């Protein structure tokens, strides 16, 4: 995919961003094949050049992309529940294992993601936390998840999703759930290392977390 991207959500701050993203149709087709014969998951590997591209892809690509490295984006279906995200992530992991690829999974999405109303937004654009989180309880929920990340307690995060969803994580936290499932799901023991400070803006919470592969494997 090549072109320039202006975000319909953030045109003031993200406009005419150039991108030149090489795809990986072989891996996409391999992931699609994981759903063959199943009635609990449907996967489409789309190479339609008119399929819209979104800032969750372009923003990450701008900083981490390499024109010589294959890159593939995966949609997050907000009709899914936790089990759906877990299944899809597991199938992605299966496809990667069947391939000859060395793959980095980037879960591009935020934590609590409820916005203040329109009149309040201009007063809440700084990155000060927890003042600019919509509700202090949502901030506390984010901190609880980050604490579990730091301990490698992915089972605790996954099992706690019914409660955490009350804090309105972006995309029902599907970006994390798919990534975690590809790495072993509840059995994954990779600890999370903060690569940034936790930031809050207009009601929402964001942070960068890196999960290094344990020496003995993702579920060691």
Q: Where are the regions a protein language model picked out?
A:
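Short, hydrophobic/aromatic alpha-helical segments in well-folded domains
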Residues: 30, 88-92, 108
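Beta-strand elements within well-structured catalytic alpha/beta cores of enzymes
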Residues: 74, 101-109, 179
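A structural signal for small-residue-enriched, beta-sheet-centric alpha/beta enzyme cores
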Residues: 111-119
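Non-transmembrane, aqueous-exposed alpha-helical and coiled segments at domain scale
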Residues: 90-103
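Flexible, D/E/H-enriched segments
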Residues: 1-87, 118-220
């Amino acid at each position: 995919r090549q072109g320039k991207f202006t975000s319909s959500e953030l045109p003031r701050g993200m406009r005419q961003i150039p991108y030149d993203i090489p795809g990986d149709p072989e891996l996409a087709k391999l992931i699609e094949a994981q759903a063959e014969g199943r009635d609990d998951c449907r996967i489409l590997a789309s190479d339609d050049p008119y399929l819209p591209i979104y800032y969750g892809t372009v923003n990450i690509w701008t900083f981490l992309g390499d024109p010589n490295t294959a890159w593939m984006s995966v949609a997050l279906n907000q009709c899914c529940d936790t089990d759906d995200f877990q299944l899809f992530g597991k199938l992605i992991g299966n496809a990667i294992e069947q391939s000859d690829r060395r793959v980095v999974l980037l879960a591009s999405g935020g934590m609590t993601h409820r916005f203040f109303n329109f009149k309040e937004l201009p007063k809440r654009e700084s990155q000060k936390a927890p003042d600019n989180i919509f509700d202090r309880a949502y901030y506390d929920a984010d901190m609880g998840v980050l604490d579990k990340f730091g301990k490698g307690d992915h089972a605790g995060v996954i099992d706690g999703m019914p409660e955490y969803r009350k804090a309105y994580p972006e995309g029902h936290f599907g970006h994390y759930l798919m990534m975690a499932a590809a790495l072993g799901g509840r059995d994954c023991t990779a600890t999370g290392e903060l690569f940034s400070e936790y930031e809050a803006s207009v009601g929402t919470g964001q942070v960068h977390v890196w999960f290094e592969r344990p020496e003995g494997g993702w579920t060691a």
